[in-house]
């Protein structure tokens, strides 16, 4: 896996990320095309679940570790697929094994209390699969 620092501005139109995988599986390919081509602006600054996720990432990692005894390491980089550099991933962290080596992807999501667990899993399954492919976990 190639790693590119998030400190550099990543042009999201230059690759396919995990959220994009969700759009593709949901059949929203036209919406994704318009975003990638710059025909519509993707402004997530007022999307509450996105903002909650950004502002609570550290807490979510700590909470997961407290509940599972599995440490989570923050990932501060945009990951690139080792063969296809247009396949990208911005993961919330790595779940570590007893040797403190990555054994899985940590991805926290904010949903409302009325959303059923099966619905959440179905919605985000493509994104997590995408992240596991890119991170090789």
Per-region residue spans from a language model:
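Mg2+/Mn2+-dependent nuclease catalytic core
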Residues: 59-61, 67-137
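Charged, glycine-rich intrinsically disordered N-terminal tails and low-complexity linkers that flank
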Residues: 1-55, 59
């Amino acid at each position: 896996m190639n790693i590119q620092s998030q400190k550099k501005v990543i042009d999201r139109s230059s690759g396919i990320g995990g959220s994009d995988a969700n759009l593709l599986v949901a059949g929203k390919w036209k919406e994704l095309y318009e975003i990638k081509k710059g025909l519509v602006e993707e402004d997530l600054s007022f999307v509450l679940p996105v903002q909650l996720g950004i502002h609570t990432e550290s807490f979510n990692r700590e909470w997961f570790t407290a509940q599972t005894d599995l440490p989570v390491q923050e990932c501060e980089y945009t990951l690139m697929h080792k063969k296809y550099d247009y396949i990208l991933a911005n993961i919330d962290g790595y779940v570590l094994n007893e040797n403190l080596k990555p054994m899985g992807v940590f991805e926290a999501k904010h949903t409302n209390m009325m959303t059923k667990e099966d619905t959440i899993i179905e919605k985000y399954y493509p994104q997590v699969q995408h992240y596991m492919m890119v991170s090789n976990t």
